[in-house]
Structure formats: C-alpha cells, structure tokens
Amino acid sequence: MLTILFLGDIVGEPGRNAVISRLPELKAKYGVDFIIVNGENAAGGRGITGKITIDLLRSGVSVITTGDHIWDQKEISAFIETEPRLLRPINYPEGAPGHGSIVLETTQGKVGVINVQCRTFMLPILENPFRVMQAAVEKMRTETSVIVVDVHGETTSEKIALGRFLAGKVSAVLGTHTHVQTADEQIFPGGTAFLCDAGMCGPVNSIIGRAVEPIVQRFISNLPAQFPVATGEVRLRGALVEIDETTGRALRISRIDEAAASSGESQSEGTLENEYKNEQENG
C-alpha cells in the first residue's frame, strides 16, 4: 500500500514554515510514502520562488503543484525549467516554461502527478482541461497506474466534473485554489479518490489566508487595497490517500486538519485524527 499526503495551498511565510516544521512528524505519524503540496501562494501569498521551492523539497516534499499564480514571481519562469518537481498547470499552451506532470520512482514503485487548471471564473483561460487530461493520463498510464491529479479551480461543479471524467483512470483527483476545505471526500467507481478542495496551509483567523480588515473594506468601498498575509494560528489542511500500488486504485481517503505546532506543543483539533487512529487500531 502507498500512502500519499496531499496538502492544500500554502499561504505565505506562516504556511510554509508550518509545513516545513511539521512534515517530518506527519510523515512518521501517518506512514506517508509520498508528499504533494500546492505552493502557488507560498511567496507572500502570491507565487513561489526558487528558494522556497528548494526549502520545501529539502523538508521532504516530493512534488510541488501550483495554479494561476505560478508566474507571479518573475524569477520562476527561468527556475521552473531547472526543477522538474515544481509543476505548472499542464494545460498551458505549448512552449510555456516548465512541465505540468512528472513521474517519480519511489520504494513503492512509480508515482505520477499531474497539475491542471480549470477554466470557469479562472484567469488566464487555458486549454480545455478535459481534453488535455485525457491525453496526459493515457500517456502517463503507460508508465504507472498510480496517478494523482491536482485540479486547481474555482467552481465545485467543474472540479467534480473532472473528477467524474477521470474516475477509474487515475488514483486521486484532489482540488485546490479556494483555500476552503470541503467535506465531500469519497472514492468514485473505479477506485478514484476525490476531494473537491483540500483547503489551505495558512492562518485560520483570516479570509482565505489574508488579513481580514483590508478585504472587508475592499468589499465595502470597491477601492484598491493591499491584502497582507494574516498572522496568528496556522493549520495544515489536505488529504491522506491510501492507494494499492499494483492496481492504482484508491483504498481510502480522509481529510487532514493539523495544528501548525506539533502535538507535544499544541493540541490538534483531533476529530479526523482520532477517526484515523481508531480505524487503524480496528483494522
């Protein structure tokens, strides 16, 4: 069995520091074999830098996915060509820097990751994700049956539609972008784990990771404003997916909601964690 930890959008320094500090403990706690994080908001809430990419990979992250903010830091266009484990959405036009997919060798066999961006209410409007994914999955399945897809999109309907479209063809379809964790984790027919949105790794006393007051005032005044990353309590949210490495079928999916501090420093919320422990103990 292959256990994959997938963490939602990392927001700014609070989010990335929490991920880096907690990853070793989470890896041991859940028996994680492979770690995927969405890093498109890791640099001050907008984009990602080369240094942040390296820091995350050194901390134990296997693959970093992104989305519509991938190009927000100017340096990334050149850097992404040098680091294949940093993905941009696969449905950018041909010739865009970097790659939208990767297959990595692990002790449990090969694991494929594909990053795709939806189109509804999303800018820039990229190539049709359904058509692009059909071709990408067919190609990747010649190398491995274990395929995890990060679907970066605004609407639940488009992400669910992509999940249904890929059911039975990939191991997991996990949504990112909204920073709000959904409660619809399930396994589609054919063994594809699905979660509409993994949520974020960032400050919870916020509006999707940003300071509250500037955003509220923006809605009131319609005037331009800066939205700094919030401070305070940080939580790590995402999903844990267990996969049969031979067939590529998902066996189980559960949501993750962990405190930034280790269990020895601060008590985690515990509901999902306790459910996981009980299931493990009861076989």
What are these regions (language model features)?
Residues 1-283:
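Acidic, metal/ion-coordinating pockets
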